[in-house]
Amino acid sequence: MEARPSGVVAATGVRRAFGDAVVLGGVDLFVEPGEIVALLGASGSGKSTLLRVLAGLDEDAEGEVHTSGSKAVVFQEHRLLPWKRVVDNVALGVRGKDAKQRAATALEEVGLAERGKAWPSELSGGQSQRVAFARALVREPELLLLDEPFGALDALTRLKMQALFARLHEAHGFAALLVTHDVDEALLLADRLLVLDGGRIAEEIKVDLGHPRSVDMEGFAVLRRRLLGLLHVPTET
């Protein structure tokens, strides 16, 4: 597949090995502006490795990777600096005299307008992850790279964060690559699904379900069964 440079992400032949273990064996991946792409695969399939390559955090990978515009990364761990207040964590690295005001605006967007002066240790897990999203949003990224950002949250908080992500995407229109192991999450949020297997993209699925989505909407269960089959997860018949 030829890279299409008009995309937010155009990657071809991405290869990454750790010693004799080849984790990525020639991955081709493309993300359109404003598109949400979910990347799924078994544990150890190389999902997080691929995201790190696309984020520019792995200099030992081979292949061609092109990203256009600004990008931000949200990890499963919020990685907030405990010695800085919440608003200062969000403003960290942001240039300009209005950096703190922009950080405060981003916190308001994620529902934490009143927590700017709090310390990270005073936040719940869900609040900490909201701060991580605010820290990404304040940079006004064209591309958001997310490595299982809701994986450490309880079920209810996870649903709330998924809804927040959908609202933020609607408001800002950024492209996103979402690494997740949650099939329902992928189907609820993504425009397109990629299954990573054997070091390559083994399957691509277009999600034509419309918005807003729910697990009981028509067509959801069919796509869910198909995706679980591709991931080699047994399903009830």
Where are these regions (language model features)?
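Short helical segment in ABC ATPase nucleotide-binding domains corresponding to the A-loop/adjacent helical element
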Residues: 87-95, 100, 206
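Hydrophobic anchor residue at the start of the ABC signature
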Residues: 133
